[in-house]
């Protein structure tokens, strides 16, 4: 639903973000284990459609994993890739672009994406050879990066490193693009900073020459954090059952609730309600006082007329009724 009106649809892309999150378990449960942050619980892997700043994004897939699951396990990423493709039409699969962080930057995963002829934008480790390539780049190779509004961003540049790296063992067509940026005032410096600049890299198989646009597309993967935060506000903050199968069902129910919310916001709501997160929606719309009146073979929803957001509910119902019946 949302992918048809997403900003990326105009460019012929269906961008899907894959990311993992930690869920704390406060008691012994099946598959609960110590996490890399010295907690205890689970480490599920989730996938969301990116719908841009003006939309909510649909949940496409989620698999629960042990708390000590390796973030870079290719088998897990391949499993969720199958689930993602099962959610999409053939035309959408042809336009699919997988976007994720360095945890997915494995030969096995990128090889499979290439075999399936899918696009990707994946975080790439800034290793020693990458640092050497960056230092070897002439100043003229760097072009200004752009911000979220696609305007030139001061103090940030992007450049391609592919011709300076040995990428023979990686899939054909893979490019490595680097971004350097002066750290913000007060930011903690890192040992991996080069010449006083914060360096991030990503790999992509997109052939386009517009490096700032490709870098901006990759940086927008941060929006998946909003989806995961919304998932935890929808019920993913805790997996309540002792057995793993029931907890996987719980994850599916949470993702279904997110889909229903996303479809409602995409199809029926407007303004602030169309982009509000679950907590805000519960306050403004879901918790409004109302009663059902049955009279004359009709069912009437009588809303609290004093509630300032009641007109948004009426408008949403009117909008939904105006859509043609499916089929």
Regions found by a protein language model. Name each.
Residues 37-46, 115-130:
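Acidic, His- and aromatic-enriched active-site or binding-groove loops in soluble protein domains
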Residues 35-91:
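Electropositive, glycine- and tryptophan-enriched low-complexity nucleic-acid-binding patches
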Residues 121-232, 315-327:
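An anionic, glycine-rich sequence signature occurring as long contiguous blocks
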Residues 211-265:
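Short amphipathic alpha-helical "interface-anchor" segments enriched in bulky aromatics
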Residues 261-327:
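A short, flexible helix-boundary coil/loop motif
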């Amino acid at each position: 639903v949302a992918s048809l009106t997403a900003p990326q649809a105009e460019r012929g892309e269906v961008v899907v973000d894959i990311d993992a999150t930690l869920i704390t378990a406060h008691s012994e449960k099946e598959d609960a284990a110590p996490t890399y942050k010295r907690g205890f619980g689970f480490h599920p892997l989730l996938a969301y459609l990116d719908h841009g700043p003006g939309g909510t994004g649909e949940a496409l897939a989620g698999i629960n994993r042990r708390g000590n699951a390796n973030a870079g396990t290719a088998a897990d990423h391949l499993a969720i890739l199958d689930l993602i493709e099962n959610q999409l039409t053939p035309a959408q699969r042809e336009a699919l672009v997988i976007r994720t962080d360095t945890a997915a930057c494995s030969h096995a995963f990128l090889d499979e994406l290439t075999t399936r002829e899918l696009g990707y934008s994946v975080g790439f480790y800034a290793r020693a050879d990458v640092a050497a390539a960056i230092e070897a780049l002439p100043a003229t190779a760097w072009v200004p990066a752009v911000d979220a509004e696609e305007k030139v961003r001061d103090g940030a540049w992007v450049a391609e490193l592919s011709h300076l790296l040995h990428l023979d063992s990686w899939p054909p067509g893979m490019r490595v693009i680097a971004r350097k940026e002066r750290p913000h005032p007060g930011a903690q410096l890192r040992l991996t900073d080069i010449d006083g600049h914060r360096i991030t890299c990503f790999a992509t198989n997109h052939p386009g020459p517009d490096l700032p646009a490709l870098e901006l597309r990759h940086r927008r993967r941060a929006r998946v954090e909003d989806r995961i935060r919304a998932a935890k506000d929808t019920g993913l903050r805790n997996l309540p059952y002792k057995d793993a199968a029931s907890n996987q069902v719980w994850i599916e129910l949470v993702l279904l609730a997110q889909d229903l919310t996303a479809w409602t916001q995409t199809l029926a709501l407007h303004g602030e309600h169309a982009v509000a997160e679950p907590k805000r929606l519960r306050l403004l719309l879901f918790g409004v006082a109302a009663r059902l009146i049955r009279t004359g073979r009709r069912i009437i929803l009588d809303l609290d007329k004093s509630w300032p957001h009641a007109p948004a509910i009426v408008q949403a119902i009117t909008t939904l009724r105006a859509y043609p019946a499916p089929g």
